[in-house]
């Protein structure tokens, strides 16, 4: 690898630190602000130079389209696992479901988070859980009425507000366009995978 200028080394360290702390690379504007550049274009020129030297990879079309080469990534199984598509009948934390690990301190959430789940759809938008968010989840097996849970119903995983009435469970959306999911425990399978304890959006805790 060709040697870096002091400014390039500073930017590379900022990128690594941002990924370690938030799980996301910084935007060009964030780099410019933190390092005192007059514009995001100045940051872009330095990023192109870093890419030419093989220190980073630039993915066009997105403000956070910066990634470290594989050898630069922290591939250790530390931090919070991000759960992707969940296979029927498999534990949600099975290794094959883990897309990657985010360097996020679990104690930032209360109670502490055990894993992250990428939100799909807008059924919980009225309480600020949006498509593409990373939902921080504390693993439990039981829930109280009113809690927002990650539930598995007949092997479909969903995020909803929990309500139990006798042998019936209602999983309520926070969007008037969606009807509650009704689960009759006498013949349907319901597993509580965890409680929603926070949201990460664009690298920020909400």
UniProtKB/Swiss-Prot annotation:
Organism: Shewanella sp. (strain MR-4)
Catalytic activity as recorded in UniProt: Hydrolysis of Ala-|-Gly bond in repressor LexA
Taxonomic lineage: Bacteria, Pseudomonadati, Pseudomonadota, Gammaproteobacteria, Alteromonadales
Protein name (record): LexA repressor
Record-listed E.C. numbers: 3.4.21.88
Family that this chain belongs to: Belongs to the peptidase S24 family.
Active-site positions on this chain: 123, 160
Pfam families in the cross-refs: LexA_DNA_bind, Peptidase_S24
Subunit structure, interactors included: Homodimer.
Site (Cleavage): 88-89
Major enzyme class: hydrolase
Gene Ontology molecular-function annotations: DNA binding; serine-type endopeptidase activity
Single biological process term from Gene Ontology: DNA replication
Physiological role: Represses a number of genes involved in the response to DNA damage (SOS response), including recA and lexA. In the presence of single-stranded DNA, RecA interacts with LexA causing an autocatalytic cleavage which disrupts the DNA-binding part of LexA, leading to derepression of the SOS regulon and eventually DNA repair.
């Amino acid at each position: 690898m060709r040697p870096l200028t002091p400014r390039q080394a500073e930017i590379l360290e900022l990128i690594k630190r941002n990924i370690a702390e938030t799980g996301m690379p910084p935007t060009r504007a964030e780099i410019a602000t933190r390092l005192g550049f007059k514009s995001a274009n100045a940051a872009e020129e330095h990023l192109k130079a870093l890419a030419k030297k093989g220190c980073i990879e630039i993915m066009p079309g997105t403000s956070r389209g910066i990634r470290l080469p594989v050898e630069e990534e922290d591939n250790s199984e530390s931090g919070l696992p991000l759960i992707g598509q969940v296979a029927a009948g498999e534990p949600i934390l099975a290794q094959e479901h883990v897309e990657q690990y985010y360097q996020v301190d679990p104690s930032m959430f209360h109670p502490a988070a055990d894993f992250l789940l990428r939100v799909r759809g807008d059924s919980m938008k009225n309480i600020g859980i949006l498509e593409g968010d990373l939902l921080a989840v504390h693993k439990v097996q039981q829930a109280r009425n009113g809690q927002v849970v990650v539930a598995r119903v007949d092997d479909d995983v969903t995020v909803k507000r929990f309500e139990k009435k006798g042998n019936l469970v209602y999983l309520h959306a926070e969007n008037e366009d969606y009807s509650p999911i009704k689960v009759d425990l006498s013949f349907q399978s319901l597993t509580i995978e965890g409680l929603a304890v926070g949201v990460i959006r664009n690298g920020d805790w909400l």
